[in-house]
């Protein structure tokens, strides 16, 4: 398939920059290398079974809602007796078989690849004795700012977006909204993490985002710690991946829609500081039109054009 060919070409570029970061985490990256690291991280968000399952559930939820609405119309028709034995509860148990959700998830992610081009990143160097864990859904989205504001969900265009992905047990990368946060020293492209609490918090995020499978350095995690991480996944991972929007009535009927439920795990990181404009904002002063979304910047240059 064409998408597999594109992935094969890009994976070679991604491997080069990841190997360079692992070998020299404090070193500088070229503009193209920075973009390749960014592209790897963004594509990874849609390249997992978790995202495929999310797509499947989103399609199922939407089609189930449409089926209920169609049934409602049929019940009000002249032949309503034909449909009286069909209940909404029965429709809730119907599963619509959507072919190749993983392919659609990946295609969608490619279309969204430059949605987060305005984010900056820092290499996270773990200097503690506690190693990073990873999972079968390794790239985790978050927004500490929107969590503090009490907003129920976030997406790639949200204010305060953060994306964390561990590369090794002691090297990770975090992309972040530079208008909302400061990470470490502004003059450095890395942050040295010396507090075990920060590693535990990042591991909590990774565990909560996992799709049932964790990976860790042999001997680095005790059985009690594994049970704790498993408990965090069960507690913080949304029980439902997809929720329906309230119906919007129109002259031609109603508009129905759905949204993805976001992960919130009370993330607390000592090296992430909100900038004054947002740090001083209180929940009661939060305005969706002003504070919910970022001004997305699309860089129209040769590096970006190579990805299309």
Question: What would you call each of these model-derived segments?
Answer:
Residues 1-308:
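Alpha-helical structural context detector biased toward long hydrophobic helices
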């Amino acid at each position: 398939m064409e998408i597999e060919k594109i992935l094969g070409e890009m994976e070679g570029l991604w491997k080069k920059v990841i190997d360079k970061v692992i070998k020299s985490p404090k070193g500088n990256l070229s503009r193209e290398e920075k973009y390749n690291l960014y592209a790897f991280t963004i594509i990874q968000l849609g390249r997992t079974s978790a995202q495929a399952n999310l797509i499947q559930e989103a399609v199922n939820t939407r089609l189930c809602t449409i089926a209920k609405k169609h049934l409602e119309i049929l019940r009000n028709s002249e032949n309503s007796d034909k449909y009286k034995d069909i209940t909404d509860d029965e429709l809730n148990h119907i599963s619509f078989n959507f072919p190749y959700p993983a392919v659609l998830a990946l295609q969608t992610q490619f279309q969204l690849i430059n949605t987060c081009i305005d984010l900056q990143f820092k290499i996270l160097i773990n200097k503690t004795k506690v190693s990073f864990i990873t999972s079968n859904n390794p790239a985790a989205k978050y927004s500490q700012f929107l969590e503090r504001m009490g907003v129920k969900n976030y997406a790639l265009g949200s204010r305060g977006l953060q994306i964390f992905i561990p590369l090794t047990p002691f090297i990770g990368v975090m992309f972040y909204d530079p208008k909302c946060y400061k990470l470490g020293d502004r003059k450095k492209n890395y942050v040295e993490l010396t507090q075990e609490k920060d590693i535990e918090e990042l591991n909590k995020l990774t565990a909560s985002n996992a799709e049932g499978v964790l990976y860790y350095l042999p001997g680095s995690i005790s059985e009690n710690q594994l049970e704790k991480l498993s408990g965090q996944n069960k507690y913080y991972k949304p029980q439902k991946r997809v929720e329906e929007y309230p119906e919007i009535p129109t002259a031609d009927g109603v508009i129905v829609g759905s949204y993805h439920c976001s992960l919130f795990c009370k993330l607390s990181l000592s090296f992430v500081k909100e900038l004054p404009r947002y740090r001083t904002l209180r929940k009661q002063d939060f305005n969706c039109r002003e504070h919910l979304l970022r001004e997305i910047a699309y860089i129209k240059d040769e590096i970006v054009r190579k990805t299309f």
